[in-house]
């Protein structure tokens, strides 16, 4: 199975070269880097976390540098576009997508905190008119009501379900801890909550 690494912003350009070569050597299939600058902040935190995008030129330079550092043609660099998170337009996201693909990005990830998913749908459909082959990646955390079949009909190739397995495990962990505390032993917890 392919393994995709979350590379955050990719760091400084000179560090991204090292990251690409290291990931390739480890057998990782792809890295996703986001077009933000500054310290790492979750894109879904809302308006309290200010998202600052890199310039198109700066991010294209990072993509080109990463592609030039690759040893094999198999490794993919996927550009994550934060325009919709930052409150910018779909047109801005599309302009960035076109520039990033031109710079060598092997895929485009579009991100949004809009619960309807309408902006993602419009982006994907408009991007597909101009570019039929570049993979589109989405993370449908906030628009979780949309099915994979619908996403595929928009032109989406990959859906990432970010930390859903971990988040679903918390409920069982809390119940397990409560059982141990209530029973002053683990026997009941093992029988009920453990595999």
Regions found by a protein language model. Name each.
Residues 164-195:
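Extended, intrinsically disordered, low-complexity segments
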Residues 1-161, 168-171:
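Alpha/beta enzyme core
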């Amino acid at each position: 199975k392919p393994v995709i690494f979350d590379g955050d912003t990719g760091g400084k350009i000179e560090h991204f070269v090292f990251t690409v070569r290291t990931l390739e050597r480890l057998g990782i299939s792809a890295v996703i880097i986001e077009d933000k600058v500054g310290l790492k902040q979750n894109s879904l935190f809302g308006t309290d976390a200010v998202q600052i995008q890199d310039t198109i030129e700066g991010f294209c330079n990072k993509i080109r540098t990463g592609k030039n550092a690759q040893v094999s043609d198999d490794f993919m660099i996927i550009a994550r576009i934060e325009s919709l998170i930052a409150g910018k337009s779909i047109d801005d996201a599309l302009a960035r997508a076109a520039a990033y693909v031109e710079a060598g990005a092997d895929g485009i990830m579009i991100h949004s905190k809009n619960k309807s998913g309408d902006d993602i749908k419009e982006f994907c459909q408009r991007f597909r008119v101009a570019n039929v082959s570049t993979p589109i990646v989405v993370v449908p955390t906030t628009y979780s009501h949309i099915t994979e079949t619908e996403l595929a009909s928009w032109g989406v190739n990959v859906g990432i379900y970010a930390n859903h397995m971990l988040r679903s495990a918390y409920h069982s962990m809390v119940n397990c801890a409560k059982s141990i505390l209530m029973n002053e032993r683990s026997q009941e917890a093992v029988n009920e909550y453990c595999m």
